[in-house]
């Protein structure tokens, strides 16, 4: 039961991440959640920050890994 609830929560988080992803970073593939203060994306990817529309002055700490545009 615990894993079902965690799966549902992850789906909600990923759906919101896609909606709030920064358009300047390209398409958010949502393969992994990254943290802005750590290098948590694989090589060839960068951490693209979520836009926080609910709290305009809030500090952005999370994002999603997107492929570098080269």
From Swiss-Prot:
<keyword id="KW-0964">Secreted</keyword>
<dbReference type="GO" id="GO:0005576">
    <property type="term" value="C:extracellular region"/>
</dbReference>
<feature type="signal peptide">
    <location>
        <begin position="1"/>
        <end position="17"/>
    </location>
</feature>
<dbReference type="GO" id="GO:0090729">
    <property type="term" value="F:toxin activity"/>
</dbReference>
<keyword id="KW-0800">Toxin</keyword>
<keyword id="KW-1015">Disulfide bond</keyword>
<keyword id="KW-0732">Signal</keyword>
<protein>
    <recommendedName>
        <fullName>U-scutigerotoxin(02)-Tl1a</fullName>
    </recommendedName>
</protein>
<comment type="similarity">
    <text>Belongs to the scutigerotoxin-02 family.</text>
</comment>
């Amino acid at each position: 039961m615990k894993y079902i609830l965690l799966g549902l929560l992850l789906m909600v988080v990923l759906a919101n991440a896609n909606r709030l992803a920064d358009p300047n970073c390209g398409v958010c593939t949502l393969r992994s959640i990254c943290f802005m203060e750590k290098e948590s994306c694989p090589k060839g990817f960068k951490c693209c920050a979520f836009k926080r529309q609910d709290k305009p002055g809030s500090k952005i700490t999370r994002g999603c890994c997107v492929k570098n545009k080269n």
